[in-house]
Amino acid sequence: MTSQRFQELLKNVKTNLGSVWVEFRSSVEERLKHPHIWKIIDREQLATILMFFLGIPKMFRLSQNMKIRQMRNMRKPGVMEMTPDTNQTEQPCPSQMTNTETSKEPESVSLNSSTKDGDLDPNKQMKNLRRDSSSSQESADLEEDHRMLGGRMRMIFKRRQGMRKKSQSLSHLRSQAVYQDTTEAAISPSTWKSFWPPQLRLRDDNSWSSVNLSQTDPTKN
């Protein structure tokens, strides 16, 4: 991007935003003059600069998401949380001073027990309920996933076992058929008729009988 184009973009943005852009540009120009600019500008400011210079909506969404994330971090317990000062006790009104001591004792006991247990804070109760519900939902989801995965694994195992048994039975039948073919070919006399000596003749009952060559060979007559 040339400097002339950059100046044109600056003028366009300045005319559109008015006085807000003047303050923003002055702060950006002061930061851009610094040699270690990338160490000064954080991600949110860089996203805002890119949003104004290039007009990318994604950068604007990034800055908004970062702001939302910062607000969520502020709401987390233990991070910038204003804890109430339990040491400072409120002084009762004169109308409350007229009450008897017997009416004050159960209130103090209940307050102390409730503050120790933390039952009076509705935010903590809601957080605990949400945490319990989320943990129970996660455990239920995990159990469902394990159940579905176990069912799928069992189905795959049974399918593979059935395919293995089927292949074994097919191979057994194939080998048995080949064995039967070979035994039938070996035992059948018709297959050995051409290889048998000419002085033997096959009978109708598949038995062999010896004959003379003069009786079988017409050339001998």
From Swiss-Prot:
The gene is C. It comes from Tupaia virus (isolate Tupaia/Thailand/-/1986) (TUPV). Disulfide bonds: none annotated. Residues 84-101, 183-193, 207-221 have a biased composition (Polar residues). This is Protein C. Residues 75-149, 183-221 are annotated as: Disordered. Residues 116-133 have a biased composition (Basic and acidic residues). Does not belong to rhabdoviridae replication core genes, and is specific to sigma virus: protein C is presumably involved in host-virus interactions.
